[in-house]
Amino acid sequence: MRILVTNDDGIQSKGIIILAELLSEEHDVFVVAPDKERSATGHSITIHVPLWIKKVFISERVVAYSTTGTPADCVKLAYNVIMDKKVDLIVSGVNRGPNMGMDILYSGTVSGAMEGAMMNIPSIAISSANYESPDFEGAARFLIDFLKEFDFSLLDPFTMLNINVPAGEIKGWKFTRQSRRRWNDYFEERVSPFGEKYYWMMGEVIEDDDRDDVDYKAVREGYVSITPIHPFLTNERCLKKLREVYD
């Protein structure tokens, strides 16, 4: 396959280098990734300033470019400019840390894959779910094995897979729902060396979903969480209720 690999941790991150190297043993791999970390940029794109592309070296088997854009920009540039619209699969990652629950709305990693899904190209976001001790190689090797078994024709149009891999021994994988996992944010007030006040965002994770088949519970139990997601955000049940009342 011709595989496009991107991420939000940047072109020099260990996660993308390990993933690209291992995928290139069996596939034609193109890396197009941000020239610096773009974590938590969501699905932003660049429209008011130029985008620059620079060829970089990762290995002999991998064609790689850095860009000044976001992960979504990288996918657009790769598809339309670098790869001449010949892409069989898009993989975004391996991210350092989980992308579960409401994280996916902020995640540049997920948005890179979602951009592919919006083009109706098979797309996967993959994350090593332990931020402090990420196992990039373990996640990459899981993905390689998964690609040999998974039938992408089972996915609905414009649908991608969000994969979170636990560190350590993997018991198996589970298809999961996106959880209600979220953050309680607060801001720590600090003072610069120049005496100027500034704020640093902090947060505490909230994991109180009462459903059993959600992403973070699978990861906590040692399973890879695989969640099919899409860009369409309409709450169908609420829409039906509103129409019944107001139409």
Curated annotation (Swiss-Prot):
Nucleotidase that shows phosphatase activity on nucleoside 5'-monophosphates. It holds the Pfam family SurE. Its main location: cytoplasm. Gene3D superfamilies: Survival protein SurE-like phosphatase/nucleotidase. GO terms for cellular component: cytoplasm. It comes from Thermotoga petrophila (strain ATCC BAA-488 / DSM 13995 / JCM 10881 / RKU-1). Binds 1 divalent metal cation per subunit. The keyword Acyltransferase does not apply. It is an enzyme of class 3 (hydrolase). Its EC number is 3.1.3.5. This is 5'-nucleotidase SurE. The keyword Hydrolase applies. Coiled coil: none annotated.
